[in-house]
Amino acid sequence: MNVQENVLPSIELLVLKRDGRTVSFDQDKIFSALRRANQELEHPVSEAGLKIVLEAVLAEIGRRFEKDVQIYEIQTVVEQELLKAHLYDLAELYIQYRTRRDFRRHQATDINVEIHKLLSKDQSVVNENANKDADVFNTQRDLTAGIVGKSIGLKLLPAHVANAHQKGDIHYHDLDYSPYTPMTNCCLIDFKGMLAQGFKIGNADVESPKSIQTATAQISQIIANVASSQYGGCSADRIDEVLAPYAELNYQKHLKDAKDWVLADKQEEYARAKTQKDIYDAMQSLEYEINTLFTSNGQTPFTSLGFGLGTSWFEREIQKAILNIRIKGLGREGRTAIFPKLIFTVKRGLNLEPDSPNYDIKQLAIECATKRMYPDMLSYDKIVELTGSFKVPMGCRSFLQGWKDENGQDVTSGRMNLGVVTVNLPRIAMESAGDKDKFWEIFAERMAIAKDALVYRVERVKEATPANAPILYQYGAFGKRLAKTDAVDEVFKNRRATVSLGYIGLYEVATVFYGGEWETNPEAKDFTVDIIKKMKNLVEAWSDEYGYHFSVYSTPSESLTDRFCRMDTEKFGIVKDITDKEYYTNSFHYDVRKNPTPFEKLDFEKIYPAVGASGGFIHYCEYPVLQQNPKALEAVWDYAYDRVGYLGTNTPIDHCYACDFEGDFEPTERGFKCPNCGNSDPKSVDVVKRTCGYLGNPQARPMVKGRHKEISVRVKHMNGSSL
């Protein structure tokens, strides 16, 4: 309800916020606070009664204050007027609500409170990152350090940014690492340059490798060190093309040996067979190395391998080895590898069509996706169209925009992202109570706060020195080799680095204004598209102002889907199709409870990256078991090629080793169980679900409640009759 009517006095005051900001007086906020407290009463006050209280509050504020007023002074007036009206129960609840908020604000920076949550295994702490096993010592150490980092970080942030984060208006990502340390987020490691020129890790000067086995061993060491020097994911772009020269060294060595020991007409065949085995063994070692690594962050490195564009014999063999190794699985039981994320590029004229030269590898990639969910698919031409040049995402979905260096050369590898701040869009919609003018007013306020938060992120990472992370700044991971005294801004400025404005919950936003079945309503769709367009216009202006690439990022929201919804449930109560689900819908995604066809879903979602959300995005389709019908998946891939840039496959691949069931496990309150025998023991089941951009194993490493709820209600976009 909007209470700004003619019968209410108009007040022109400035409100001095706790965080030091000055904002215009807004009587709707007082009324909303009264309504929230009133909803908790067994016998609530009527709407008319609340309005009488508000009139008295406004009259008293107008009488007592002329130019500005403090927040606590407004609250005192409200409490006094409630007591004057003999609304003692409502006054008590209002005071409790305010006190509770103050208490939580102080708790957030109290290390003892957060340590207690960790020791008591509060799921919001131990399950915040589904890639971290909170039972092991090194993860516990990281979580403990993270609590200290968050506490100090909140004190370092500009007061209004910290306040907005604590209230749930925005989310300042990775507070356990930044701004306490000036770490960067995710990157595309310059493996090509590092392998060619050598590098240094610790006390070891590492020379350029002389074989593919040594090259992959070096890559695993680089990944471990880079992942320990930043907090986000790391990706290898065109790994098949990067490794091919080292595979060729193996071939030349085997060919030289063959000339001494093998008949002339068999020498090339011998060298190829030996090299093929070397390639397979090297790529298998890399897969095992990544899955057995633990970084100083207490987790397996978030790693992505991009491949598929190479055409030489060596490049093709590397592509095939990556896929065949993933199909085989890990260990004696052949479990699905969670890392590295595989990203296969499809390109017209190369592997898209049946008569293209690498079509056979596309077929292998599709087989792999039906059995292991990875690889995800990149559409070469669409990525170029959306981002200005081709590259794989950093981590799971963060895309760099096209960028040329001082020599006019297109550069992707060696670039990075400096961090993310996500805005709670559903909250803005609910605060506006269906008034679009109010929505855009609050939207502008939140975007201004997000801008300040992102600018602070940039300024903080610039305070690092090359000595803080030698692998990144001095030895080539970031594409340049700085001296110890150089400014790290050399690898960030002139839009070389990105910094991301995230968002969540377009579905919920439109639901506030148009109801939960809005997807076929053009007016509702246009409204959500306008939100992305406005965000894009803002980040372009910020980029021009500051010289760093601000981008619009479709946040993965692994735990944020839970945090924002939980906080808004406390603020607005149970709201149909919004907070009652116990999660918020990721970015621009179609409501997961509905079942459009894959083609309808992609057609619905394709506009959002195109109009601005190109700084980070991914599309998914949910399928039944596909292993007996890979052509169904190929049909979706082919349809997607000219429509979306990045597509993931979600298909049931859970396995029970007790009864040998394979398919889709049933969700339980905190995990999943075999539908055949009820087994839920992580030692004898392999449960693999799409957690966000990455896969996760929720039975072994549980996720937050909101994400579990969202996974549990996902509906297939293709049924048996569609296959």
Where are these regions (language model features)?
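Contiguous, well-ordered alpha-helical segments that form the cores/surfaces of helical PPI scaffolds
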Residues: 241, 499-512, 533, 690
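Long insertion/accessory domains within large nucleic-acid-processing enzymes
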Residues: 678-723
